Protein backbone atom coordinates (compact mmCIF):
# COMPACT_ATOMS: atom_id res chain seq x y z
CA UNK A 1 0.00 0.00 0.00
CA UNK A 2 1.16 3.54 -0.67
CA UNK A 3 0.87 6.95 0.94
CA UNK A 4 0.39 6.84 4.68
CA UNK A 5 -1.89 9.90 5.26
CA UNK A 6 -4.33 8.74 2.56
CA UNK A 7 -4.32 5.26 4.10
CA UNK A 8 -5.28 6.56 7.55
CA UNK A 9 -8.06 8.72 6.10
CA UNK A 10 -9.33 5.80 4.00
CA UNK A 11 -9.32 3.53 7.06
CA UNK A 12 -11.53 5.89 9.03
CA UNK A 13 -13.77 6.52 6.00
CA UNK A 14 -14.22 2.90 4.93
CA UNK A 15 -17.93 2.09 4.81
CA UNK A 16 -18.70 -1.43 6.03
CA UNK A 17 -21.94 -1.43 4.01
CA UNK A 18 -19.89 -0.64 0.89
CA UNK A 19 -17.42 -3.41 1.77
CA UNK A 20 -20.38 -5.80 1.62
CA UNK A 21 -21.39 -4.43 -1.78
CA UNK A 22 -17.88 -4.63 -3.23
CA UNK A 23 -17.17 -8.06 -1.75
CA UNK A 24 -20.36 -10.11 -2.27
CA UNK A 25 -19.25 -12.93 0.03
CA UNK A 26 -18.77 -10.39 2.83
CA UNK A 27 -22.25 -9.02 2.10
CA UNK A 28 -23.79 -12.51 2.24
CA UNK A 29 -22.03 -13.27 5.55
CA UNK A 30 -23.23 -9.98 7.02
CA UNK A 31 -26.79 -10.65 5.87
CA UNK A 32 -26.72 -14.17 7.33
CA UNK A 33 -25.53 -12.78 10.67
CA UNK A 34 -28.39 -10.25 10.71
CA UNK A 35 -31.08 -12.78 9.73
CA UNK A 36 -31.83 -14.13 13.26
CA UNK A 37 -32.30 -10.58 14.56
CA UNK A 38 -34.70 -9.77 11.70
CA UNK A 39 -36.68 -12.98 12.31
CA UNK A 40 -36.83 -12.24 16.05
CA UNK A 41 -38.35 -8.81 15.38
CA UNK A 42 -40.92 -10.28 13.00
CA UNK A 43 -41.88 -13.05 15.45
CA UNK A 44 -42.51 -10.38 18.08
CA UNK A 45 -44.77 -8.45 15.69
CA UNK A 46 -42.19 -5.70 15.17
CA UNK A 47 -40.69 -4.34 12.02
CA UNK A 48 -36.96 -4.93 11.89
CA UNK A 49 -34.89 -1.76 12.16
CA UNK A 50 -33.80 -0.25 8.87
CA UNK A 51 -30.16 -0.91 8.16
CA UNK A 52 -28.00 2.20 8.09
CA UNK A 53 -27.19 3.70 4.70
CA UNK A 54 -23.54 4.01 5.75
CA UNK A 55 -21.51 2.39 8.50
CA UNK A 56 -18.08 3.99 8.54
CA UNK A 57 -15.34 2.75 10.81
CA UNK A 58 -15.04 6.23 12.32
CA UNK A 59 -18.71 6.03 13.40
CA UNK A 60 -18.74 2.60 15.08
CA UNK A 61 -18.28 4.09 18.55
CA UNK A 62 -21.35 6.34 18.08
CA UNK A 63 -23.80 3.48 17.44
CA UNK A 64 -25.97 2.53 20.45
CA UNK A 65 -24.49 -0.41 22.33
CA UNK A 66 -27.66 -2.48 22.10
CA UNK A 67 -27.42 -2.14 18.31
CA UNK A 68 -23.88 -3.52 18.21
CA UNK A 69 -22.01 -0.28 18.75
CA UNK A 70 -18.34 -0.54 19.64
CA UNK A 71 -16.49 1.27 22.43
CA UNK A 72 -13.49 3.38 21.47
CA UNK A 73 -10.65 1.89 23.50
CA UNK A 74 -7.87 4.01 22.11
CA UNK A 75 -6.91 6.26 19.24
CA UNK A 76 -3.49 7.42 18.10
CA UNK A 77 -4.19 9.75 15.20
CA UNK A 78 -2.57 8.71 11.93
CA UNK A 79 -1.42 5.49 13.60
CA UNK A 80 -3.92 3.17 15.30
CA UNK A 81 -7.51 2.80 16.44
CA UNK A 82 -8.75 0.15 18.88
CA UNK A 83 -12.41 -0.71 19.38
CA UNK A 84 -14.02 -3.05 21.89
CA UNK A 85 -17.26 -5.00 21.97
CA UNK A 86 -18.74 -7.18 24.72
CA UNK A 87 -21.46 -9.69 24.03
CA UNK A 88 -22.67 -13.25 23.77
CA UNK A 89 -21.69 -13.50 20.11
CA UNK A 90 -22.58 -17.19 19.85
CA UNK A 91 -26.28 -16.51 20.32
CA UNK A 92 -28.40 -16.17 17.17
CA UNK A 93 -29.53 -12.74 18.44
CA UNK A 94 -26.45 -11.31 20.12
CA UNK A 95 -26.86 -10.17 23.72
CA UNK A 96 -24.61 -7.09 23.97
CA UNK A 97 -23.35 -5.83 27.32
CA UNK A 98 -23.80 -2.16 28.14
CA UNK A 99 -20.17 -1.07 28.24
CA UNK A 100 -19.82 2.66 27.62
CA UNK A 101 -16.15 3.47 28.10
CA UNK A 102 -12.69 2.02 27.73
CA UNK A 103 -12.42 1.65 31.50
CA UNK A 104 -15.77 -0.16 31.72
CA UNK A 105 -14.53 -2.48 28.97
CA UNK A 106 -11.37 -3.27 30.93
CA UNK A 107 -13.30 -3.77 34.19
CA UNK A 108 -16.15 -5.82 32.71
CA UNK A 109 -16.17 -9.32 34.21
CA UNK A 110 -19.81 -10.48 34.28
CA UNK A 111 -19.83 -14.24 33.67
CA UNK A 112 -21.05 -15.57 30.35
CA UNK A 113 -19.66 -12.92 28.01
CA UNK A 114 -16.85 -12.48 25.50
CA UNK A 115 -14.82 -9.29 25.09
CA UNK A 116 -13.42 -8.56 21.63
CA UNK A 117 -10.80 -5.98 20.72
CA UNK A 118 -10.35 -4.93 17.11
CA UNK A 119 -7.18 -2.91 16.53
CA UNK A 120 -6.36 -1.42 13.14
CA UNK A 121 -3.08 0.29 12.42
CA UNK A 122 -1.28 2.15 9.67
CA UNK A 123 2.52 2.08 9.56
CA UNK A 124 4.74 3.98 7.18
CA UNK A 125 7.32 1.60 5.71
CA UNK A 126 9.20 4.16 3.67
CA UNK A 127 8.60 6.62 0.88
CA UNK A 128 5.24 5.82 -0.68
CA UNK A 129 4.89 2.50 1.20
CA UNK A 130 2.40 1.77 3.99
CA UNK A 131 1.42 -1.29 5.99
CA UNK A 132 -2.24 -1.52 6.97
CA UNK A 133 -3.04 -4.25 9.47
CA UNK A 134 -5.87 -5.45 11.65
CA UNK A 135 -5.79 -7.65 14.73
CA UNK A 136 -8.84 -9.07 16.46
CA UNK A 137 -8.57 -10.70 19.88
CA UNK A 138 -11.30 -12.18 22.05
CA UNK A 139 -11.25 -13.19 25.72
CA UNK A 140 -14.12 -14.65 27.70
CA UNK A 141 -15.19 -13.84 31.23
CA UNK A 142 -15.54 -17.44 32.38
CA UNK A 143 -15.09 -21.07 31.37
CA UNK A 144 -18.65 -21.58 30.15
CA UNK A 145 -18.42 -18.54 27.86
CA UNK A 146 -15.06 -19.83 26.61
CA UNK A 147 -16.66 -23.15 25.60
CA UNK A 148 -19.56 -21.40 23.86
CA UNK A 149 -17.25 -19.00 22.05
CA UNK A 150 -14.86 -21.78 20.99
CA UNK A 151 -17.76 -23.74 19.42
CA UNK A 152 -19.05 -20.60 17.72
CA UNK A 153 -15.62 -19.72 16.34
CA UNK A 154 -14.68 -23.25 15.33
CA UNK A 155 -17.83 -24.04 13.34
CA UNK A 156 -17.22 -21.55 10.57
CA UNK A 157 -17.58 -18.17 12.20
CA UNK A 158 -13.83 -17.75 12.54
CA UNK A 159 -13.35 -18.15 8.79
CA UNK A 160 -16.18 -15.72 8.13
CA UNK A 161 -14.66 -13.15 10.49
CA UNK A 162 -11.35 -13.43 8.66
CA UNK A 163 -13.13 -12.79 5.35
CA UNK A 164 -14.83 -9.73 6.81
CA UNK A 165 -11.56 -8.31 8.15
CA UNK A 166 -9.74 -9.05 4.89
CA UNK A 167 -12.55 -7.38 2.92
CA UNK A 168 -12.35 -4.26 5.09
CA UNK A 169 -8.57 -4.04 4.70
CA UNK A 170 -8.74 -4.70 0.96
CA UNK A 171 -11.36 -2.01 0.30
CA UNK A 172 -9.39 0.41 2.51
CA UNK A 173 -6.29 -0.29 0.39
CA UNK A 174 -8.23 0.39 -2.80
CA UNK A 175 -9.57 3.67 -1.40
CA UNK A 176 -6.11 4.78 -0.24
CA UNK A 177 -4.51 3.98 -3.59
CA UNK A 178 -7.26 5.84 -5.44
CA UNK A 179 -6.80 8.87 -3.17
CA UNK A 180 -3.03 8.74 -3.62
CA UNK A 181 -3.43 8.65 -7.40
CA UNK A 182 -5.79 11.65 -7.28
CA UNK A 183 -3.38 13.49 -4.99
CA UNK A 184 -0.48 12.85 -7.40
CA UNK A 185 -2.28 14.45 -10.36
Predicted segments with their positions:
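Beta-strand/loop substructures that line and gate deep hydrophobic ligand-binding cavities in soluble
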Residues: 103-159
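Hydrophobic-ligand binding "helix-grip"
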Residues: 62-127
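Secondary-structure boundary elements
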Residues: 3-6, 123-129, 141-143, 169-183
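Short, solvent-exposed loop/turn segments at secondary-structure junctions
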Residues: 16, 87-90, 137-139
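A conserved amphipathic terminal alpha-helix motif
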Residues: 149-184
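Short amphipathic alpha-helical segments with coiled-coil-like heptad repeat character
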Residues: 15-20, 80, 180-181
Amino acid sequence: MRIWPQTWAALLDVDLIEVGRKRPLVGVLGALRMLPDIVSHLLHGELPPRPPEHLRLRDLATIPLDKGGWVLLGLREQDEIALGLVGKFWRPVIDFASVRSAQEFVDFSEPGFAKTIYALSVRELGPRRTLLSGVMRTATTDEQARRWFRRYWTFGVGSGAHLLVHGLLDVTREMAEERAAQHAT
